[in-house]
Amino acid sequence: MKHAIHHIHFVGIGGAGMSGIAEVLHNLGYAISGSDLSDSATLRRLAGLGIATHVGHAAAHIEGADAVVTSTAVQSDNPEVLAARERKIPVVPRALMLAELMRFKQGIAIAGAHGKTTTTSLVTSVLAEAGLDPTFVIGGKLNSAGANAKLGQGDYIVVEADESDASFLNLLPVMAVVTNIDADHMETYGHDFGRLKGAFVDFLHRMPFYGRAIVCVDSPAVREILPQVARPVTTYGFAEDAQVRALNVRAEAGSMHFTVRRSNGQSYPDLDVVLSLPGEHNVLNALSAVAVAMELEISDDALLRAFESFKGVGRRFQRYGELAAADGGSFTVIDDYGHHPVEMAATLAAARGAFPGRRLVLAFQPHRYSRTRDCFEDFVKVIGLADAVLLTEVYAAGEAPVVAADGRSLARALRVAGRVEPVFVENVAELPAAIAVNARDGDVLLCMGAGSIGAVPGKLVEMLQKQELQAQQGAAQ
């Protein structure tokens, strides 16, 4: 049946998931437009591709659109959404549009509380190295591709599946990975962990009867749902009973070296892997890609090449290099999206392994008052693992403030715990200057959070380079 959809408008096009879908549809030949509340590098990149972008929301922006796609961050009273409904233009949630894209290819969906973006990127890289030319939509920039989405010519599409709003239940993959299940985004599930686990079972049952579930049995909640999963399953992890298992794990110069043992009914040789990512959590992410490769009969050589040449993902342990410290030496800057205590603990451990013996400075912007409230004690414990801490006010992400779940309360709790004396920087715009004052020679600075702190490393680099240039000019006079 010939449809009449030619022009698709995205409300909130600056988000990682939205921009990726928009780019793939643009490359499929659709006329794409979009708007976002603020300007960003993403908007500018999309404009460079020929996509009409707007800063701010207005009813006029949807002129000529045959469908309007919305992100979960967009409210129902958004002027573009209201105008679309008034004109009887279909308003489509992001996940439904992603599901439409997946209908035309063999879908591989990556779900889980933590590690989705890196795992999706690793799986994509393995398929690309094997010559399968996948389409992908990722929640972060795949550095080797310079983008978070690409329209491939192959049979597969690799996507992140978002459980935060239960929208992953719209997808119909033929293969699904579950990296872990954790108590995050609990408001979506009525603060009922059983409902959250049930949603993951339902997600796996969105696959056809022949679909393959690839799950990490190191996650207790994943292990708990296994008896309910009525699909073929491959397990992975460090656990002795995992069918794809990592042994002899060691960190070397920012990479992970380990042996993969595979035992899912067929005879496979052990694989000695070099993964160009730090941290044991990334070893687990890589194991899921091994399981996908086994299912698709990808050669071990392609798998090993993909892991060793992996160039990482934007804002996932992203290195900004060495910057001049105030005491005359230099410090290393790393940017990371981690914003849940479990993610932060894994990233801090990875930093310890990659930079043994060095002082670890954590600059952290909490994300959402509800998460800060629900995970307050865990935040205190994990933040205290750093040697020095700079803490900002909570990035609200549209939420109203919650009493005793703000940045100052977290700073006070850290002081009471006595493990670290935090420097509280209320305005994130002042964080680069505070970092410059506190960073010493040999430090490793980790900027972490899912909010506006993502712009801090770039601004810090710009500020210190400007200061260095001014100093050189002053010395020359």
Curated annotation (Swiss-Prot):
Cell wall formation. Its EC number is 6.3.2.8. GO terms for molecular function: ATP binding; UDP-N-acetylmuramate-L-alanine ligase activity. It is found in: Cytoplasm. This is UDP-N-acetylmuramate--L-alanine ligase. Keywords: ATP-binding, Cell cycle, Cell division, Cell shape, Cell wall biogenesis/degradation, Cytoplasm, Ligase, Nucleotide-binding, Peptidoglycan synthesis. It comes from Delftia acidovorans (strain DSM 14801 / SPH-1). Belongs to the MurCDEF family. GO terms for cellular component: cytoplasm. It comes from the Bacteria. It holds the Pfam family Mur_ligase_M. The lineage of its organism: Bacteria, Pseudomonadati, Pseudomonadota, Betaproteobacteria, Burkholderiales. It catalyses: UDP-N-acetyl-alpha-D-muramate + L-alanine + ATP = UDP-N-acetyl-alpha-D-muramoyl-L-alanine + ADP + phosphate + H(+).
